[in-house]
UniProtKB/Swiss-Prot annotation:
Keyword Thylakoid attributed: yes
Upper taxonomic lineage: Eukaryota, Glaucocystophyceae, Cyanophoraceae, Cyanophora
Family of the protein in this entry: Belongs to the Ycf48 family.
Annotated protein name in UniProt: Photosystem II assembly protein Ycf48
Main location: plastid
Organism: Cyanophora paradoxa
Signal peptide positions on this chain: 1-28
Function: Essential for photosystem II (PSII) biogenesis; required for assembly of an early intermediate in PSII assembly that includes D2 (psbD) and cytochrome b559.
SUPFAM superfamilies recorded: Oligoxyloglucan reducing end-specific cellobiohydrolase
Record flagged with keyword Transcription regulation: no
Record-linked NCBIfam families: PRK13684.1
GO annotation terms (biological process): photosynthesis
Domain of life: Eukaryota
Pfam families: PSII_BNR
Length: 333
């Protein structure tokens, strides 16, 4: 009798695991991603390309790390900014034409008008609330700056003067993102709640988190709706683009439904329907149907790195940024 029960249990487990791996962890083609060697062990934080020079791009990281590529990311050369020391955590880069901006902490702002051949440092006021966290180039001489406590400023004269966009900052935040239409979403330091702001508002609007799980990061879809990654590997999408009263679709679980999660950290859309999610311990997942089914990328299993950021510069080329100088390049074959 005991033996029969053991057979039933074993058969049941086999069925569950087989269905789980077939549905949630179907392996993606491993040849799509390649690791690019870099002469650094620093954490890589952001990447940006020059629209007027599409082969040219820049890669940022901790300890003032700056790399340049002229072949669309196949190879990279370390560049020096000639700063007084290497203490800066360069965390955001953005270009419009050949004009570009780089921010970092402690507070630093760099500006270029020639695609990065030369960089000039723009002084920031000691009264700036917080340190720069996100920079967005908006056109000739125009940019928008968000700090790590939710202050937002805009310049229209190449950084000579800045105008505050909100009356008061939000408080310490863990992540901040900007949509194509100029709206922002920020996650509180502990992930307990998130806040939104759109142009014309005089303050942030705070919202409770959607589930009992703390928020890891948030951002915007291609149609300016919200996405949310929570602890334990859940992914949420808003069903509308209303910031005042966002509605949320049921959670998706890219890593499966067995009850574990390695920690999902960032998300990027390659196309309107193809999504890639990166996370800790070399986890990389993709969906071809806007998150309904997922595949696990196996070529990154043995890379000892957390994948902090994933970014696609077009439909053919994308990058994953991690710690210990880890850089992956996506090539559409």
């Amino acid at each position: 009798m005991i033996l029969n029960w053991r057979k039933v249990i074993v058969s049941f487990l086999v069925i569950i695991l087989t269905n789980f791996y077939n549905i949630s962890f179907t392996h993606a083609e491993s040849y799509k991603w390649e690791q690019i060697p870099l002469n650094t062990d620093e954490i890589l934080l952001d990447i940006g390309f020059v629209p007027d020079q599409p082969q040219r791009g820049w890669l940022l990281g901790t300890r003032s790390t700056l790399f340049e590529t002229t072949d669309k990311g196949k190879t990279w050369e370390l560049r020096s900014l000639n700063l007084e020391d290497d203490k800066y955590r360069l965390n955001s880069i953005s270009f419009s034409g050949k004009e570009g901006w780089v921010t970092g902490k402690p507070a630093i702002l760099l500006h270029t008008t020639d695609g990065g051949s030369s960089w000039s440092r723009i002084p920031l006021s000691n009264q700036l609330p917080g340190d720069p966290a996100l920079i967005t180039a908006l056109g000739t001489g125009k940019a928008e700056l968000a700090t790590d406590i939710g202050a937002i400023y805009r310049t229209e004269n190449s950084g000579q003067t800045w105008k505050a966009q909100i009356q008061e900052p939000l408080g310490v935040i863990r992540t901040v993102a900007r949509s194509e239409n100029g709206s922002y979403v920020a996650v509180s330091a502990k992930g307990n709640f998130y806040s939104t702001w759109k142009e014309g508002d005089d303050k942030w609007i705070s919202h409770p988190r959607q589930s009992s799980r703390r928020i890891q990061s948030m951002g915007f879809t291609n149609n300016n709706r919200l996405w949310m990654l929570t602890r334990g590997g859940q992914l949420w999408f808003s069903s509308n683009d209303s910031f005042d009263e966002p509605n949320w679709e049921g959670p998706k679980t890219p890593e499966g439904k067995v009850g574990f999660g390695l920690g999902l950290l960032n998300l990027a859309f390659k196309t309107p329907t193809e999504i890639w999610v990166s996370g800790g311990s070399g986890i990389l997942l993709s969906s071809q149907d806007t998150g309904n089914t997922w595949k696990k990328e196996t070529s990154t299993d043995n890379i000892p790195s957390n994948f902090y950021k994933i970014s696609f510069i077009d439909k053919e080329v994308g990058f994953v940024l991690g710690n210990q100088g880890t850089l992956l390049r996506y090539v559409s074959l």
